[in-house]
């Protein structure tokens, strides 16, 4: 697929997706969303150990492109929103950890992207907002990701007021993992992703899958599911190698992906 609004590159063991529409504040048109979906599907099918979602310009993403939305019929609007939902679910479904590298403003579906990514690093000047609540179109779909990334009351505050929050608040509320000087965002993003992708690739993939599957279950069901997954995983070669290496006091030698 030829990309017009994004780029997909490889940096060592990481895949890097960069939104490249700064003149439109990286607004998410249907074509832009399709490119992002294709990129993450490609990453999921490939050998990269982790993925970075970054953006050019001073705005990470302004959310949906209203020029692309205006005048759409109900069926056309539904198709667009379902495409966006498919992208968000794909980011969490692929085996690799995905980290958002945020420098600037992330609003509406742009904030939804940050909330969806497994990890996020933000620059000190970054801001996060779901502004629909103070206008005429509530940010219902961004709320799905937001409510699963921060507390219920913090999510509803953002959704209902539409007020922006700064990077320090985003960190305190759990929307991002790290806040660093703007000049250090790229470095810290790669450092955190490096730590999040070390160890067995297959174990990490299973861990990510089971994390998202159990998180919305009630506690007994979550323990039942997690117990079965962990018990079965104990029989894999990488798990056995981990045990042997610990007992033999040596570094583990995990299988290659």
Regions from the PLM with identified roles:
Residues 1-3, 244-257:
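Terminal low-complexity tails and localization/encapsulation signals of metabolic enzymes
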Residues 7, 89-204, 236, 241, ...:
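Crotonase-fold acyl-CoA enzyme core
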Residues 11-20, 31-72, 90-101, 119, ...:
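A structural preference for short, pocket-lining loop segments at secondary-structure junctions
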Residues 17, 53, 65, 113-115, ...:
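Hydrophobic/aromatic residues within transmembrane alpha-helices
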Residues 32-35, 80-83, 185, 226:
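Hydrophobic alpha-helical membrane-association signature
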Residues 71-83:
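A short acidic, glycine-rich active-site loop
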Residues 158-159, 210-214, 228-234:
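Helix-loop "lid/cap" segments that line or gate small-molecule binding pockets
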């Amino acid at each position: 697929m030829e990309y017009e609004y994004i780029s997909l590159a490889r940096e060592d063991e990481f895949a890097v997706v960069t939104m490249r529409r700064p003149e439109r504040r990286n607004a998410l048109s249907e074509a832009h969303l399709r490119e992002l979906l294709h990129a993450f599907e490609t990453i999921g099918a490939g050998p990269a150990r982790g993925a970075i979602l970054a953006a050019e310009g001073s705005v990470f993403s302004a959310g949906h492109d209203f020029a692309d939305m205006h005048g759409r019929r109900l069926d056309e609007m539904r198709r667009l929103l379902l495409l966006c939902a498919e992208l968000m679910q794909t980011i969490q479904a692929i085996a690799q950890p995905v980290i958002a590298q945020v420098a600037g403003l992330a609003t509406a579906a742009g904030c939804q992207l940050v909330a969806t990514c497994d990890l996020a690093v933000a620059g000190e000047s970054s801001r996060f907002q779901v502004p629909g609540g103070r206008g005429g179109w509530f940010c219902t779909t961004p709320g799905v990701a937001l409510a699963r990334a921060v507390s219920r009351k913090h999510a509803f505050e953002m959704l209902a007021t539409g007020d922006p929050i700064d990077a320090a608040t985003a960190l305190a509320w759990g929307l991002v993992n790290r806040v660093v000087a703007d000049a250090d965002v790229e470095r810290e993003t790669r450092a955190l992703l490096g730590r999040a992708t070390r160890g067995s690739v297959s174990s990490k993939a299973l861990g990510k899958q089971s994390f998202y599957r159990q998180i919305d279950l009630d506690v007994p069901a979550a323990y039942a599911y997690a117990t079965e997954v962990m018990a079965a995983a104990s029989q894999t070669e990488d798990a056995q190698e981990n045990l042997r290496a610990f007992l033999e006091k040596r570094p583990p030698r995990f299988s290659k992906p």
